[in-house]
C-alpha cells in the first residue's frame, strides 16, 4: 500500500490537478493526503471539500515532508508537489509502476520543463559538490536530482530531515549511503509556475555539506572554506536570469573552480562544465 502525499503551501489555484493524479494512481488500501504547509489561501479547506485528508504541517518543505512521514502508516510514500499545471503522464502512476517494475527503494520522477530550461542549483551546486563528496550518489541521478516527485520506502527517510529545501538532498544522499537503490522514471513534460525560491540554493548547498561533515566526508575544520567556495555561486544564482549569457558563463566558471581542501582525496579538482 502507498500513501500519496501532495505537499504544498498556498496552492489552492492548482491543488486539484495534483490530487486528481493521485486519486487516479491510487488503488485499494492506498491513501491520498494533502500536506498543508501553513497555507493561508484556503488550500486545506479545498482539499477537505474534495474528500481528501489534510495533514497540517509547519512552513517549510522539509517540515511538511517530516509531518507526512510521521503520520504515514504504509510502507511506501509518494511525494507530489502541489503546483502542477499539467504533466503528459500521470506522475504518481508512473512512479508507482516504476517502483513495482524495478523493486527499487526510491524512484525519482524526471521530466522535461520547456518553460524552465535553466536550473542553476542542479548544475552549479548539486553537481560539483556531490560529484566529489558523494560520487556514488551522483551516478544515480541523471537529470533532476532535486525533483519533488518521488516514491520511496518510508524507512529510507531516517534521521531529522532538513526543515526546508534540503529534503531531497537528504533523501538522495542518505539513501545511497545506506545501500538503498534509487531508480528514475520519466513522467513526461511538466508545466507549472516558475517561482523564485531565494532560499533554495543556500539550503541545498548547506544540506550537502552538513551530511558530508556528519559522515566524515568533509573535515569539520574545513567547513568554512567550503562555505566560502559557495558564496560567489550563490550570489551569481541570485543575479542570473535564463537569458543572461554573460552571467551564466560566469556562474559556470564559478562552479568549475577547484574545491577547497578537507574533502575526500581528489577534491582539489577542476570540475569544468559543472
In which residue ranges do the predicted regions lie?
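Active-site donor/metal-binding and catalytic loop motifs
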Residues: 185-203
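A conserved acidic beta->alpha catalytic loop
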Residues: 36-44
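Short, well-formed alpha-helical segments that are part of the catalytic scaffolds
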Residues: 10-24
Amino acid at each position: 500500500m502507498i500513501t500519496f502525499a501532495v505537499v504544498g503551501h498556498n496552492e489552492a489555484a492548482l491543488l486539484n490537478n495534483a490530487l486528481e493524479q493521485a486519486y487516479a494512481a491510487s488503488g485499494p488500501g492506498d491513501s491520498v493526503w494533502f500536506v498543508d504547509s501553513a497555507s493561508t489561501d484556503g488550500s486545506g479547506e479545498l482539499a477537505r471539500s474534495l474528500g481528501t485528508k489534510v495533514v497540517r504541517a509547519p512552513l517549510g518543505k522539509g517540515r511538511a515532508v517530516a509531518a507526512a512521514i510521521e503520520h504515514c502508516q504504509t510502507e511506501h510514500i509518494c511525494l507530489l508537489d502541489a503546483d502542477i499545471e499539467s504533466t503528459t503522464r500521470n506522475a504518481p502512476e508512473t512512479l508507482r509502476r516504476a517502483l513495482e517494475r524495478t523493486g527499487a527503494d526510491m524512484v525519482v520522477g524526471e521530466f522535461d520543463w520547456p518553460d524552465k530550461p535553466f536550473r542553476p542549483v542542479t548544475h552549479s551546486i548539486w553537481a560539483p559538490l556531490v560529484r566529489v563528496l558523494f560520487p556514488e550518489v551522483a551516478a544515480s541521478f541523471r537529470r533532476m536530482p532535486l525533483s519533488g516527485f518521488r516514491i520511496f520506502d518510508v524507512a529510507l527517510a531516517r534521521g531529522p530531515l532538513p526543515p526546508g529545501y534540503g529534503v531531497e538532498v537528504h533523501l538522495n544522499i542518505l539513501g545511497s549511503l545506506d545501500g538503498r537503490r534509487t531508480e528514475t522514471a520519466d513522467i513526461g513534460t511538466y508545466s507549472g509556475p516558475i517561482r523564485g525560491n531565494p532560499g533554495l540554493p543556500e539550503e541545498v548547498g548547506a544540506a550537502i555539506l552538513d551530511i558530508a561533515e556528519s559522515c566524515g566526508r568533509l573535515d569539520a575544520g574545513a567547513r568554512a572554506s567550503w562555505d566560502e567556495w559557495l558564496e560567489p555561486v550563490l550570489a551569481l544564482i541570485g543575479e542570473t536570469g535564463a537569458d543572461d549569457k554573460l552571467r551564466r558563463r560566469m556562474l559556470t566558471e564559478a562552479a568549475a573552480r577547484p574545491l577547497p581542501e578537507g574533502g575526500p582525496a581528489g577534491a582539489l579538482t577542476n570540475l569544468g562544465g559543472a
